[in-house]
C-alpha cells in the first residue's frame, strides 16, 4: 500500500457558501482560508492545491469586535516617497466591502503559488446575490 499524494487528477473540488452577516471578519476569513487550502479534508497535502471553492456573501455586513472599527486602517504604498495611502475601515466598508475580507483571507494563505492559486477560487459579494447558483454550493454556518 502506498502513501496517497494529491494532484490535479485526483482532487475533487466542492463549492461552499459562507454568510458573513453579523459575524466577525476574522472568523469568517479563517473559515474561508481553511476551505481554500483544503485543511478540512483527509486528503490534505501541504504542497498541493487541494482546496475547495468558497463564496462569501453579505461581506458588507461583517463586523469587527472592540474598537477596531474606528482604529483599523488599510494601507497601500505606491513605492514613491510620500506614496502611503491610508483608508479607515468604516470608509472601506462603504466603498469596497469585499476588499476587507479579501485582504484578511490573503494574509492567512501561504505566500507562494499555492496561496495565489487558492485565492483565485475565492468569490466575495457585498450582498446576498451571487452568480454561482449553477454549481449548487453547500451553505455552511
Where are these regions (language model features)?
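Short, highly charged C-terminal tails/helix-capping segments
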Residues: 124-132
Amino acid at each position: 500500500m502506498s502513501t496517497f499524494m494529491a494532484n490535479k487528477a485526483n482532487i475533487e473540488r466542492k463549492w461552499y457558501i459562507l454568510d458573513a452577516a453579523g459575524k466577525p471578519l476574522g472568523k469568517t476569513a479563517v473559515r474561508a482560508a481553511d476551505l481554500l487550502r483544503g485543511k478540512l479534508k483527509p486528503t490534505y497535502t501541504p504542497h498541493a492545491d487541494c482546496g475547495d471553492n468558497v463564496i462569501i456573501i453579505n461581506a458588507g455586513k461583517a463586523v469587527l469586535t472592540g474598537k477596531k472599527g474606528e482604529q483599523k486602517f488599510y494601507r497601500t504604498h505606491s513605492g514613491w516617497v510620500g506614496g502611503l495611502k491610508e483608508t479607515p475601515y468604516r470608509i472601506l466598508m462603504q466603498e469596497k466591502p469585499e476588499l476587507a475580507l479579501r485582504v484578511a483571507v490573503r494574509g492567512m494563505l501561504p505566500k507562494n503559488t499555492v496561496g495565489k492559486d487558492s485565492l483565485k477560487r475565492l468569490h466575495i459579494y457585498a450582498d446576498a446575490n451571487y452568480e454561482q447558483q449553477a454549481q449548487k454550493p453547500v451553505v455552511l454556518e
